Amino acid sequence: MKTNKEIEILLYNYIKGSELVNRVNGSLSHVGRPIGSKLEDIVVSCKSGTSGQFQSFVCDVNIYVPNINANGESLQNSSRIVELTSLCVPLFNKFVSTEFRIEYDETPKAIEIKGVNEYCINNRIVLTHLNLE
């Protein structure tokens, strides 16, 4: 049986070699976002999991995207959000391996982070792990 932390690390390692990581200017983490970061960071977290031979985990892969400044006004960097989301979809949409399966739990969405002039692309996925232990 796997724990939430083990699944976070598994998901982290799956994402680590992807084009998504190569395209952001920040870091990839499974222990939280660096304090005060203004970069495009990717944070992996698992919210809940079940036990049994097929364990299902609800996980979030959040990508933080700073706003752009347009004539002194802080605006959503929508073109960057679209670009990064387009890299997420093939990564998380019905991926299957011998050890686990990943699929979206809900459509990826950009959420405004109040007070810090950035948005978060929330990828809520379900990772199902085949427990052969």
Segments and roles (model prediction):
Residues 1-24, 45-133:
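Charged, amphipathic alpha-helical segments and their flanking helix caps
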Residues 27-38:
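Short acidic low-complexity segments
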Residues 37-46:
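A short, hydrophobic beta-strand-centered structural micro-motif
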